[in-house]
Amino acid sequence: EWYVGVTGGASLSNITLVPKLVDKAFTVGNNGGVSVRYISEPHFGLQAELNVLEAGWKEDEEGHGLSTSYERNLRLVDFPFLLHAYTGDQLFRGVLNVGPRFSYLLSSSETLVAGSTPLLHHGKPVDHPFQYGIVGGGGFELHAKRLVIGLEGRYTYYMSNLFNDAVSDDFNTSGLQVVTVNAYLQLRLF
């Protein structure tokens, strides 16, 4: 079975910075794109997607008194290649998608509140625009003849760093973490 479709939803993202300099909060963004799915065996198949993902993080400088003293927003083109597994019948299915995720940074923007103390990474460009990680998630879908309507949540742990990580650099780790919740619509071709 071959399926093509569209997906869209919300993303919740943050960054792991080691050493930790400030408290960080999640940033809410959007994501969406197109998907292709091939079911080769009962209950198993492959799925590839091409998405645009908004990610980033917020920081609260201790003692600043504001909810956010710094914010970094990233826009990435995103390519997850997933093992697709499902259980259920021809009408209602539970789904599980797991696999690698490759992303490339399209743009980056920063906001630093006046009076905040600039830190090492404030104003620093992203050193590694190509990002890779592992994604996994699950959800449910409804099959109505050739049409599939679904809802899925995913977690991505990026294993690559945004900033250089040599001994002489500022950070040992600077990896993104992203949670997405998407609705999708697919059409079975054959």
Language model feature labels by segment:
Residues 2, 24-30, 73-79, 92, ...:
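Residues that define the transmembrane beta-barrel architecture of outer-membrane proteins
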Residues 11-35, 163-165, 170-171:
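Surface-exposed strand-loop-strand hairpins of Gram-negative outer-membrane beta-barrel proteins
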Residues 18-22, 64-70, 119-126, 167-173:
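Extracellular loop and loop/strand-boundary signature of outer-membrane beta-barrel proteins
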